[in-house]
Amino acid sequence: MTAQSNITPESIVGDLRYLQLLSRSFPTIADASTEIINLEAILNLPKGTEHFLTDIHGEYEAFQHVLKNASGAVKRKVNEIFGNTLREAEKKELCTLIYYPEEKLQLVKAREKDLDDWYLITLNQLVKVCQNVSSKYTRSKVRKSLPAEFSYIIQELLHESSIEPNKHAYINVIISTIITTKRADDFIIAMCNLIQRLTIDSLHIVGDIYDRGPGAHIIMDTLCNYHNFDIQWGNHDILWMGAASGNDSCIANVIRMSMRYGNLGKLEDGYGINLLPLATFAMDTYADDPCTIFMPKMNFADAHYNEKTLRLITQMHKAITIIQFKLEAEIIDRRPEFGMANRKLLEKIDFDRGVFVYEGKEYVLRDTNFPTVDPANPYRLTEEERELVEKIHYSFMNSEKLKKHMRCLFTYGGMYLVSNSNLLYHASVPLNEDGSFKRVKIRGKEYWGRRLLDKADQLIRTAYFDEEGEEDKEFAMDYIWYMWCGPEAPLFDKDKMATFERYFVEDKELHKEKKGHYYTLRNREDICDRILEEFGASGPHSHIINGHVPVKTIQGEQPMKANGKLFVIDGGFSKAYQPETGIAGYTLVYHSHGMQLVQHEPFQSRQKAIEEGLDIKSTNFVLEFNSQRMMVKDTDKGKELVTQIQDLKKLLVAYRTGLIKEKI
């Protein structure tokens, strides 16, 4: 008996109002039946390929390359399609063209003597690759991905077989005409972009787009124009969201981080932040101060700053760091419930002797020049500092590019995501030592597990979207800073953020930040199962996907934990972490055959990729293999389609029994 035959007129009476609305889209029996056929067909297609990336930290060139080569999938498909019919050098050339069509075309045109012949060969090759990557999608979905100007032509090339004698000449004429009408370049670019788009069906960014790298704004530009993605906010993302919400402590932190790694371009060129007031203040205040410990951490082999500029960045770095400590103390005093009074450390300095007194011990300070700190009231901003904070605040609040990127983060992002039985979050779900969920008080009420992450998500949105001056917004703006460095914050979950100690104290013991229990307990399968169940993602093929803590592959650490229940996929996209991890990042790939982890070696540069065909070397590890291919019907999207089909079947019953009249 079919599902439709179980639907009776009596059973749908309560749904008639909704079915009347549905009938506007499907006004006849024929329309509803056709849609059911289409949806049933989609359910039996292989699931699309999902890519998971995390901790990009502003490394835009490596990130963009991984999207272009689909973590090695494009190269693999080119090898499968052409096998021994093309030389390795030719396959490499084709891959580079697919990744960087505009740039590669310029190089080809400068060297090729018979360009029309090259166009003919290349267009035929691209059609074959495009046919392969589009084969798991419906024609309708492919059509929606096509550039409007070439939509009809590409459809003809994709869906007509050149093997058939009657069609061979037809396809050749299409390709020849593309060349003779001087449209080959534009058509090749369109085909290459289509291949990139179809190879990755959906992209999950599991946090930390921002941080030390130079191009977080470029990554955000890429994502804002990407076809299908979501973001699980990381601690560095939250810091920028706090800055965009108007939290001055967050603003000071993001500027300090940019100075620490010598990345002024992200602020000035990327977001139009005016740093001149900070530069003027720093030069005046620290004119005779070498500011040695504030020298930016950067690869001086790649440095593009002269000595004078480096000196200025160093002074600006010190100036904003001291301002940050003062601004943070204001929040700590305003919110005693945060329990962070122990992070007010300027008051623990003996300014006369140049020592830091902490828990009964004395530590010699690495820098003792504090011209803006009043020992009697160390957290009071000077008049000049307060004026500077106001100017920088204005600059952040009026950056149109920053507003655009933050809207993107809020629209496509959240604290966590459950997708196809996988639970994605950047850092932690705070736990007690016994593995139970840690109860965290927020404004007098306790939250834990999923409730805690939901509450954090709500507060972050309140901080950005609510009207100025409202009490809820004021608290939320303070809480967004707490999310960055608070001991019970799910995006931090450490006992302290040792920023002051790392700058001013030599003793490495004081630099240590003790991680919460989550980071050890997540190795246990039962704990992971408990977390998955809490978020409604339990099942034999459910997993937690984490970032945040780099996997020290070089020391033998594995990204797969808890008997395959949890994957930590921070492998070192950030160049600064690569000596620690031994690799240059992971991509977790989830396709119809199962899950595999792609381990990347360092990306040299975009220029070398274009000119020399240097690709990222990647190693694939199969984590989970499905003996039966996973179809759309097995996914979250499939469940939605099944519901739509059921509703359409109800509509058919309504039409056939006269409860709703067809609109013929």
In which residue ranges do the predicted regions lie?
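Feature recognizes metal-dependent phosphohydrolase scaffolds
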Residues: 2-664
